[in-house]
A protein has these predicted regions:
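Surface-exposed loop/edge segments in extracytoplasmic proteins
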Residues: 64-70, 123-125
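Short, structured coil/loop segments at alpha-helix boundaries
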Residues: 18, 65, 75-79
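Conserved aromatic beta-strand anchor motif in extracellular beta-sandwich/beta-rich domains
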Residues: 59-63
């Protein structure tokens, strides 16, 4: 997303985060439902834009912890949709990024939650994806 890096320095300690324009500080990732990424049609996808190897990206299926999501290189689904609607120049073509994560829920799963923790231990609000409506 459109934004900028913020660095906070206290004495000899430094922390940083990415601040997305129009969003609160704790908006650090976006979740895409199954079927959004055509190469991974059964997976729920998380885009964690300021991710590095010290971050944790975990998922829960119907409240049960399932562990770490699997990182993969991919293209931004939002940008692919945007570019697909327009005739674009070569310089606007999508670029592969390294900050995508996938989890494949069971067929009977009703809800997936994703939790992200940054390198400084900040836990960002869980995001949910409803897979099956309540009966």
């Amino acid at each position: 997303p459109n934004g900028y890096d913020v660095f906070e320095i206290t004495g000899s300690e430094i922390e940083w985060f990415y601040k997305s324009v129009g969003h609160e500080r704790n908006w650090q990732f976006k979740v895409f439902p199954r079927g959004t990424v055509k190469e991974k049609p059964n997976s729920v996808i998380a885009k964690v834009w300021n991710w590095d190897k010290k971050w944790q990206v975990k998922w829960y299926e119907d409240g049960a912890a399932k562990g770490a999501m699997q990182r993969f290189n991919g293209y931004d689904p939002d940008y692919l949709e945007y570019v697909g609607r327009l005739k674009t120049e070569k310089y606007t073509q999508p670029q592969e990024s390294f900050f995508y994560f996938e989890a494949t829920p069971s067929e009977k799963a009703r809800e997936i939650e994703i939790e992200v923790t940054d390198r400084f231990g900040h836990i960002f609000p869980r995001q949910k994806v409803v897979l099956l409506p309540d009966k």
